[in-house]
Each structure stands twice: as C-alpha cells, then as structure tokens.
C-alpha cells in the first residue's frame, strides 16, 4: 500500500526567512502554485484517496484543499488535528533566522534547529502569540500544549495520531493523504522508515512535493520516492 505525504506550499514566513512553528501564516503565490502542481501530479498519476489528514494551521489546510481540488477529490473527508502541527520553535517563533544567528551564534542556532533532542528557549505561555491563548487549542490540557519542541518531542506528540488515526485507516483499506509540515512529516517518516537519530538531521522534505511511502500490508516500510 502507499501513503502520500505533502509538506505545505511555500509560506509567507518561508519567504521572509522567519521561524514559524505554530504561528499561523498563509501561503505565498508560489506556495499556492506548488500545491496546484502537486494536485495535478496526483491526478496525472491516478492517485485516489479516501481520507486526508492535516494540521490545524492555515498553510497546511489550504495546501490540502488545493491539492484535493486539483486532483478532483475535494469531497473526501478531511481530519484536522493539532498533533500534525509543525514543530514548536518556542521563543524563536517570529524571529529572523539570520538575525537570530548573529545574536546567538551560528553554532547555537544550528543546535536549536537541527539537534534531535535539544529544544530552543520556551515561549512564555502568557505571550499573546502563545498557543495557550489560541482557541483552536482550548480543548487540549494546558500541560500538553508545548512551549517549545525538538524533533524528538514532535515525534512523541505526532505518534499517537499515527497510531490512533492514520495507521488504522490504512489497515482498514483506506487510501491516505497526509498534508502537514516539514518537521511533523520528518518525525513520522523517521518512525515509519526507521531513520536513525543522526540520519534524520539530513532528511529533508521540500515544500509541495508529494512523497510516496510504499508499505506492506502490515505497514512495514518498503521504499519511498517523490512524484
């Protein structure tokens, strides 16, 4: 069976080189075109889906809608869940990446961005931009809502959604599309493929390009490739 991952199209803060994380930003025109191209590729290759999973962030939701519209499948059920959100970049969210490197040093910022188990500084829960003050997370216990994450923590919160929603859907015979974010998809790919903690640091998923993971009937990894 096949599972298709798509990272959201190029966003406004991708274009501005800002740390985004859980901040809710829109797609750029480039991002919209990337999503349209992805949908057309899926249509041309004959990919049909029974259900789509995405995050609760606008850039992923819009990408999912565009992909499904272009592939003539906008009618299928979509499940939105915070566990597919991007990695939470803590106090770095909204900061310019280059300026942050100049302030803290390239090495420190590299550790925050690329280390598997070291998180950036926490975002104050009282900050106006904190997820604690966003009603889309109102039903999540406050001690579960992150203030900063590394990739390890991103996997730990995404994995229950894989086990409770995505994997059962696939095992029941449903054809699944997941439209999410660079780090939430990298985290799930690490689990599915069996990528080591060291190797995952160099595993990148480009914006708007369908990544196909081939699995056997027990969801064991076989191979992966881009369309």
UniProtKB/Swiss-Prot annotation:
InterPro entries xrefs: His_Pase_superF_clade-1 (IPR013078), His_PPase_superfam (IPR029033), Phosphogly_mut1 (IPR005952)
Leading EC class: isomerase
Residues marked Transition state stabilizer (site): 181
Bilayer-spanning residue ranges: none
GO terms assigned for molecular function: phosphoglycerate mutase activity
Catalytic-site annotation from UniProt: 8, 86
UniProt GO BP: gluconeogenesis; glycolytic process
Enzyme nomenclature, EC number: 5.4.2.11
SUPFAM superfamilies with a match to the protein in the record: Phosphoglycerate mutase-like
Disulfide pattern: none
The keyword Isomerase belongs to this UniProt entry's keyword annotation: yes
Superkingdom: Bacteria
Binding-site residues, substrate: 7-14, 20-21, 59, 86-89, 97, 113-114, 182-183
Keyword entries, A-Z: Gluconeogenesis, Glycolysis, Isomerase
NCBIfam families in alphabetical order: pgm_1 (TIGR01258), PRK14115.1 (NF010713), PRK14118.1 (NF010716)
Recorded family membership: Belongs to the phosphoglycerate mutase family. BPG-dependent PGAM subfamily.
Name of the protein in its database record: 2,3-bisphosphoglycerate-dependent phosphoglycerate mutase
Designated gene of the protein: gpmA
